[in-house]
From Swiss-Prot:
Function: Ion channel inhibitor.
UniProt entry keywords in alphabetical sequence: Disulfide bond, Ion channel impairing toxin, Knottin, Secreted, Signal, Toxin
Lineage: Eukaryota, Metazoa, Ecdysozoa, Arthropoda, Chelicerata
Gene Ontology CC entries for this record: extracellular region
Origin superkingdom: Eukaryota
Record propeptide residues: 25-52
One term of GO molecular function: ion channel inhibitor activity
Family, per entry: Belongs to the neurotoxin 10 (Hwtx-1) family. 51 (Hntx-8) subfamily. Hntx-8 sub-subfamily.
Subcellular location: Secreted
Tissues with expression: Expressed by the venom gland.
Name of the molecule in the record: U3-theraphotoxin-Hhn1a 18
Disulfide pattern: 54-67, 61-72, 66-79
A Pfam entry, by short name: Toxin_12
Amino acid sequence: MVNTKASMFLTFAGLVLLFVVCYASESEEKEFPKEMLSSIFAVDNDFKQEERDCAGYMRECKEKLCCSGYVCSSRWKWCVLPAPWRR
């Protein structure tokens, strides 16, 4: 019968070997995660906030008019979505 200590040692050695093989294959593709993260978190010029003539959602509407689709809240002076109870 197989000894429990030997069985545990073989299992541990197998896991270490599996880790080494996976690490070796990943080291070849080491740049891939960096490229993926940089492409996800890259700031695109299209998504940067632009200075507009109108105020967007939840922006102050004291000096600027609200953009189309929003109305200026008389209570808070923010641009909000129009609703029947906000007339």
